[in-house]
C-alpha cells in the first residue's frame, strides 16, 4: 500500500524535532452543494528543526514515532 502524502502549512514549531502542520481539505456539502473548507492538524517529524511557521510543506505517512507522531516532513514548497 502506498504511503499517503499531504500538503499543508506549518503552524507550530516549538517542540524539538516536531512541527505541527495544518492540512486543509475542500468538499461539497452533501445537501447545499456549497464548497466547504475543513482543516486538521498533524504532528510531523522534523529531524533538523529546519521548518518554521508559515512554510508550506509536504508530509508523508510513516511508522509511529511517538504517541501522536505518524507523519514526517519530506519537502518544503516555499513560504
Curated annotation (Swiss-Prot):
Gene3D superfamilies: Nucleic acid-binding proteins (2.40.50.140). NCBIfam families: PRK05610.1, uS17_bact. Belongs to the universal ribosomal protein uS17 family. InterPro entries: NA-bd_OB-fold, Ribosomal_uS17, Ribosomal_uS17_bact/chlr. GO terms for molecular function: rRNA binding; structural constituent of ribosome. This is Small ribosomal subunit protein uS17. The gene is rpsQ. Keywords: Ribonucleoprotein, Ribosomal protein, RNA-binding, rRNA-binding. GO terms for cellular component: cytosolic small ribosomal subunit. It holds the Pfam family Ribosomal_S17. Part of the 30S ribosomal subunit. It comes from the Bacteria. One of the primary rRNA binding proteins, it binds specifically to the 5'-end of 16S ribosomal RNA. GO terms for biological process: translation. CDD domains: Ribosomal_uS17 (cd00364).
Amino acid at each position: 500500500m502506498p504511503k499517503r502524502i499531504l500538503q499543508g502549512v506549518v503552524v507550530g514549531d516549538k517542540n524539538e524535532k516536531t512541527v505541527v502542520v495544518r492540512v486543509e481539505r475542500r468538499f461539497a456539502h452533501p445537501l447545499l452543494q456549497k464548497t466547504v473548507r475543513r482543516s486538521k492538524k498533524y504532528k510531523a517529524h522534523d529531524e533538523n528543526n529546519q521548518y518554521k511557521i508559515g512554510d508550506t510543506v509536504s508530509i508523508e505517512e510513516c511508522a509511529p514515532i511517538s504517541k501522536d507522531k505518524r507523519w514526517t516532513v519530506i519537502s518544503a514548497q516555499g513560504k
